[in-house]
Amino acid sequence: MTTSSATTPLKQIICIKWGTKYGADYVNKLYGMVSRNITPPFRFVCFTDNTDGIRPEVECQDLPIIDYPMPVGTTGQWPKSRLWSEKLGNVTGNVLFLDLDVVIVGNIDVFFEYEPNHPVVLTRNMTNPLEKLGQTSLFRFPVGALAPLQKLFASDPQGIAEKY
């Protein structure tokens, strides 16, 4: 759902759905939680390989194209690296990424307000709080800011996935 206002910046939420592990119901529920817990205006975009069953309020776009193989036999959801591209469809500016399986129980405006001049904001990994790596179930970034990371990852996807 996109709601317009002349005085409030547009909040952009993105998610990614590929394969069959998570169906359209996850996208639809995530959209519902976001819409109940955000101050408009907002835009909700799902990058996906299958739009079947996704509610019409969700703006679906094709998965960003990558030219490197996905790692095998490693932990982590490396297809998310598609979102590190220089361009993300017609989305520009700051975005808040949410995994499809997150549960939202309160207002998420703070994620757009926290450290507004910091280019990338990651959540801490609560299962390992002393770890210096961020947790990417939720992170905010300007489109294109992670392109150098994608370039590095593309140089050795398997090796990097095994290391991290």
Regions found by a protein language model. Name each.
Residues 1-164:
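Glycosyltransferase catalytic domains, chiefly GT-A lineage
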